[in-house]
C-alpha cells in the first residue's frame, strides 16, 4: 500500500505550528530551512507540491510578547495579521536560496463554498503548480468569523487536497502517527501503520486536543484524512521530527499512519461538494430513502423524507441522516426549509398541488449529492 505514497505525483504538505516555532518564541528559521531542503528535493524528484503552513498566529504572538493563545477572535486576528507577514517572508527567502518561487494564498470557507470562487481558486493553484511555484496556503484569519472558519489547518489542508486533486496529503505533527492507545500514558501503545480512513475503530483512539499554539489534535487530523479521502487522496499522519521524513516517505519507508480512501477520485462537481463544511439544515430520511441513496445512489425524493430541521434556502447544503441519526449524505437542496416542510412525505407529482409550482421533482438531485 505504500506504493500509493511513492507513486504520488501531487502532494499537499501541512506543517503545524509546533514544528515551525522555537518553543513558541517566534519562527524557527533553521527548522524552516530544513523543511525547504526536503521540499526542494521532492520538487527535483518530480513531485508537484502545495504547502499549507501554520504558524502565523504563533509568530504574531511572539512579536506581541503574548505567551498564551488568546480566545477572543479580534486578538487572534490581530496576531495572525502580524505573524502572516513574517511567516510568508521566511518561506519566500528560504525557498529563494534554492531558486524556487513561492506564492501566498489566503483562503476562507466562503472561497470554497461558492462554486465560481472555488473554480477560480482551483485554476490559480493549478497554474502555480504547473509553473513549478510552491503555493504557501493559510486561512485568511483576519476576515473570518466563527461561522465561516475552517477551524484548523488540518481541515484546510484536506480541502486544499480536494481543490488541487492531490494524490497525497501529508500531515506533519509532533507525534509519530496514530496509535492504538495514548503513548503518553501507555508504554505498550502500538503505531497504526495503515488503515482505511473511514474505519470507525479509529475514532476511539483519536482522542486529545491541540497544543497551546495550535488548534488541531489527532481527532482533527483523522477528520481531515476522511475529508481528503472523499476526493480520492491518501493521507499520511507522521512525526515532523523524524529526520528526512519527506524523503523517506517518498522512498517507501513505513513511517507514520497511512489512511486510505474507500473510493477513487470523485467527479469535479462532487469534489466541490465534498469541500462544503457549513450545513444549514438536516433532512431525516426513512429506510427506503436511505437505501436509495446509499445503495443505489439515486436522487432524494420528497416522499422519502420524514422530518426537516433547521433553516435553509434553495441551493444551500443540508445533511441527510437516517432515523437513528447516522449521517448518510450531504447535498444542495432544491427547496427552502419552508417549502420542504410542505412537500415531504408526498410524491413528486404532488409538489405542484402543495406549493403551486415545482422547481424540481427531486428534493436533492443525485448530481448535487455526496455520500459520506
UniProtKB/Swiss-Prot annotation:
EC number: 2.7.2.11
SMART domains in the record: PUA (SM00359)
Gene Ontology CC, one term: cytosol
Residues that hold ATP according to the record: 14, 173-174
Catalytic activity: L-glutamate + ATP = L-glutamyl 5-phosphate + ADP
One Pfam family here: PUA
Subcellular location: Cytoplasm
Keywords: Amino-acid biosynthesis, ATP-binding, Cytoplasm, Kinase, Nucleotide-binding, Proline biosynthesis, Transferase
Keyword presence, Isomerase: no
Alphabetized SUPFAM superfamilies for the sequence: Carbamate kinase-like, PUA domain-like
Entries under InterPro entries matching the protein: AceGlu_kinase-like_sf, Asp/Glu/Uridylate_kinase, G5K_ProB, Glu/AcGlu_kinase, Glu_5kinase, Glu_5kinase/COase_Synthase, Glutamate_5-kinase_CS, PUA
Record pathway: Amino-acid biosynthesis; L-proline biosynthesis; L-glutamate 5-semialdehyde from L-glutamate: step 1/2
GO BP of this protein: L-proline biosynthetic process
Residues annotated for substrate binding in this entry: 54, 141, 153
Span of domain PUA: 280-358
One GO MF term: glutamate 5-kinase activity
Free-text function comment from the UniProt entry: Catalyzes the transfer of a phosphate group to glutamate to form L-glutamate 5-phosphate.
Protein family (similarity comment): Belongs to the glutamate 5-kinase family.
Name of this chain's protein: Glutamate 5-kinase
Source organism per UniProt: Pseudomonas syringae pv. syringae (strain B728a)
Amino acid at each position: 500500500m505504500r506504493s500509493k505514497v511513492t507513486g504520488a505525483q501531487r502532494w499537499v504538505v501541512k506543517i503545524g505550528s509546533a514544528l515551525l516555532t522555537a518553543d513558541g518564541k517566534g519562527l524557527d528559521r533553521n527548522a524552516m530551512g530544513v523543511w525547504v531542503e526536503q521540499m526542494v528535493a521532492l520538487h527535483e524528484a518530480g513531485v508537484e507540491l502545495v504547502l499549507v503552513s501554520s504558524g502565523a498566529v504563533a509568530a504574531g504572538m511572539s512579536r506581541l510578547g503574548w505567551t498564551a493563545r488568546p480566545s477572543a477572535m479580534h486578538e487572534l486576528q490581530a496576531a495572525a495579521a502580524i505573524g502572516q507577514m513574517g511567516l510568508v517572508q521566511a518561506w519566500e527567502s528560504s525557498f529563494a536560496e534554492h531558486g524556487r518561487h513561492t506564492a501566498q494564498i489566503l483562503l476562507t470557507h466562503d472561497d470554497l463554498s461558492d462554486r465560481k470562487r472555488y473554480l477560480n481558486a482551483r485554476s490559480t493553484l493549478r497554474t502555480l503548480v504547473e509553473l513549478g511555484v510552491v503555493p504557501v496556503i493559510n486561512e485568511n484569519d483576519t476576515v473570518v468569523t466563527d461561522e465561516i472558519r475552517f477551524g484548523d489547518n488540518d481541515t484546510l489542508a484536506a480541502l486544499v487536497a480536494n481543490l488541487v486533486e492531490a494524490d497525497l496529503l501529508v500531515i506533519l505533527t509532533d507525534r509519530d502517527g496514530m496509535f492504538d492507545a495514548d503513548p503518553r500514558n501507555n508504554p505498550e501503545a502500538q503505531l497504526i501503520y495503515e488503515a482505511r480512513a473511514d474505519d470507525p475503530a479509529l475514532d476511539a483512539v483519536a482522542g486529545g486536543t491541540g497544543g497551546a499554539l495550535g488548534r488541531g489534535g489527532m481527532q482533527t487530523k483523522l477528520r481531515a484524512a476522511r475529508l481528503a479521502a472523499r476526493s480520492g487522496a491518501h493521507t499520511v499522519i507522521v512525526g515532523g521530527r523524524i529526520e528526512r521524513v519527506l524523503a523517506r516517505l517518498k522512498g517507501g519507508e513505513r513511517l507514520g499512519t497511512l489512511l486510505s480512501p474507500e473510493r477513487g477520485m470523485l467527479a469535479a462537481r462532487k469534489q466541490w461538494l465534498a469541500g462544503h463544511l457549513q450545513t444549514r439544515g438536516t433532512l431525516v430520511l426513512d429506510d427506503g430513502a436511505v437505501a436509495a441513496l446509499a445503495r443505489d445512489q439515486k436522487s432524494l425524493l420528497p416522499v422519502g423524507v420524514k422530518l426537516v430541521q433547521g433553516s435553509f434556502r434553495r441551493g444551500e447544503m443540508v445533511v441527510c441522516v437516517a432515523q437513528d441519526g447516522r449521517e448518510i449524505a450531504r447535498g444542495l437542496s432544491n427547496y427552502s426549509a419552508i417549502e420542504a416542510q410542505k412537500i415531504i412525505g408526498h410524491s413528486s407529482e404532488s409538489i405542484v398541488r402543495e406549493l403551486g409550482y415545482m422547481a424540481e421533482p427531486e428534493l436533492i438531485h443525485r448530481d448535487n449529492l455526496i455520500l459520506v
